[in-house]
A protein has these predicted regions:
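Bacterial N-terminal signal peptides
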Residues: 8-16
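A short helix->beta-strand "capping" segment at the edge of beta-propeller domains
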Residues: 37-55, 94-96, 231-244
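Bacterial N-terminal signal peptides that target proteins for export
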Residues: 1-8
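Short, tryptophan-glycine- and acidic/Ser/Thr-enriched carbohydrate-recognition patches
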Residues: 29-39
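Repeat-blade elements of multi-bladed beta-propeller folds
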Residues: 23-31, 55-83, 104-135, 148, ...
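A structural motif specific to WD40 beta-propellers
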Residues: 49, 93-97, 143-147, 188, ...
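Short loop/turn segments that connect beta-strands within beta-propeller blades
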Residues: 86-91, 138-141, 182-185, 282-285, ...
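Sec/Tat signal peptide C-region and signal peptidase I cleavage site
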Residues: 17-22
Length: 471
């Protein structure tokens, strides 16, 4: 009765209840890879609201959370960095809420986190790295909840995990596809709930801090600050693994569709490792439902819209030197059995996922400087937009606008209906931080977020993460 009266009072006063904060449980936020989950349109008349300067390389997209974004980056000597940045335009010098780097992060980090509830999940390692870690952190404080070591050659965690019903699914390079239970962990041989182990870690951290304060009083010159390496390291429960030991090589993010997981496996020519195909797996046990052979490596990974699976493929990865002569392909498959609906050659590599709009447009970028829109079911062309530079990053779709960022650091806002240019914004010139954009834009709360990098420069140059809002 009290709840009914309270609701009636809210209605009578005309109060607005804000919607619950949407999770970001997979790459680009959803299976359609739109880079937007709250349904709010992005900026129509752009203005840079804030800039976070750095020398780290933001080669991957940030993931939005509650009042913050989580930005992976490559630091000095390719060290891993993950920072939580306040999205408040007035944050100023207090923009960085917390940050993780060495020695906590052991390897380079290009994995955009999955954000689910009060936690974030991401991995480290890239390219030739091996034996990475999968991490689960408290989203607000950045404290570790659990960690999972995955030993082996050519094993690395580049793609955002997909988290659904408490389980996380992810590609692990030569480790194939893995599934874990994020809610159950093992510590000192004992099984326990992840929530219970947080209390144990917090208690231990308090003890370490108290010891440090006591040591400082005795002899401040020899007091050693507490390290997270001294904390307990619970590990999540492995549910299943498929395609490991180099049978598959899965770097791109996997995607969930109903009771299935879709994963793109590449073939590494130099290492003669991996099977070039798209696999559809049973989410419960990892068994294979079907496979579809591919002509080119599926570096962009799969997207799902209705009963259609779209895979972006490329002859190259994220290497500007290989852009001349790059080839690409978009393949559309039936979700039920993997049969080909249509396939389309692209005059450039497609290295970021296809985004699928609510009205059935498949939109993708390529290294031939173009943004393409086709009918997702038939492949029939709808429109094409040409920029002055190649694209590595994919698009974000928010409202009736498509957002894309080219390698020269220029943001393009296009009309979803016909691809006509609405506005352009040169991030480098506006921020005096000339650089490249490898990542795909993210739109959250009506604002757009994107980072730059100078990974191909011989000099240390300023990089930025920018927030673009309405004038």
């Amino acid at each position: 009765m009290m709840k009914v009266r309270l609701f009636g009072l809210i209605v009578a006063l005309g109060l607005v209840i804000p919607p619950a904060r949407a999770d970001w449980p997979t790459s680009r936020g959803n299976a359609q890879r739109t880079g937007n989950v709250d349904g709010q349109p992005g900026p129509k008349s752009p203005k840079i609201l804030w800039v976070q300067e750095s020398t780290d390389h933001y080669v991957s997209a940030p993931s939005p959370g509650k009042g913050m974004i989580y930005a992976p980056a490559l630091g000095t000597l390719n060290s891993g960095v993950l920072s939580a940045l306040s999205t408040d335009p007035a944050a100023g010098a207090k923009r960085v809420l917390w940050s993780k780097s060495q020695p906590f992060l052991k390897l380079p980090t290009v994995c955009s986190p999955a954000v689910v509830g009060d936690t974030i999940i991401f991995g480290d390692g890239m390219h030739q790295n091996e034996s990475p870690m999968l991490y689960c952190l408290d989203a607000a404080k950045g404290t570790a909840i659990w960690q999972m070591s995955i030993p082996g050659p050519l094993i690395h965690l580049e793609g955002t995990p997909t988290v659904i019903d408490g389980n996380a699914y992810f590609g692990a390079g030569n480790g194939g596809v893995m599934a874990i239970d994020t809610r159950k962990v093992t510590l000192d041989g004992k099984d326990m709930a992840a929530g219970d182990v947080e209390k144990i870690i917090a208690t231990k951290w308090k003890e370490l801090q108290e010891k440090y304060e006591a040591d400082k009083k005795k002899d401040p010159d020899f007091a050693i600050p507490p390290s997270e390496d001294a904390l307990p390291k619970p590990a999540p429960k492995l549910l299943w693994q498929q395609g490991g030991q180099g049978k598959w090589h899965v770097d791109c993010p996997v995607v969930a569709a109903g009771d299935t997981i879709l994963a793109g496996s590449a073939h590494l020519d130099a290492e003669n490792s991996g099977d070039r195909a798209l696999f559809c797996l049973n989410r419960a046990d990892g068994s294979i439902k079907w496979r579809a052979d591919l002509k080119l490596n599926p570096w962009a990974g799969p997207s799902v819209g209705g009963d259609t699976v779209l895979v972006g493929c490329s002859s190259i990865r994220f290497d500007p030197k290989e852009i001349p002569g790059a080839k690409g392909e978009i393949v559309a498959l039936n979700l039920a059995d993997g049969s080909v609906k249509w396939r389309k050659d692209v005059a450039g590599g497609v290295v970021s996922p296809v985004a699928i709009s609510a009205d059935g447009l498949a939109i993708y970028t390529a290294t031939d400087k173009k943004v393409y829109a086709v009918d997702a079911k038939t492949g029939a062309p709808k429109w094409t937009y040409t920029a002055k530079a190649p694209f590595f990053g994919g698009v974000a779709i928010a409202g009736d606008t498509v957002y894309a960022a080219d390698l020269n650091g220029v943001l393009h806002a296009l009309a979803l209906a016909d691809g006509k240019l609405q506005w352009k914004l040169d991030v480098g010139s506006k921020t005096k931080a000339l650089g490249n954009i490898y990542a795909s834009p993210v739109v959250d709360g009506g604002r757009l977020y994107i980072g730059t990098c100078n990974i191909d420069s011989q000099e240390a140059r300023k990089t930025v993460i920018v927030c673009v809002g309405e004038k």
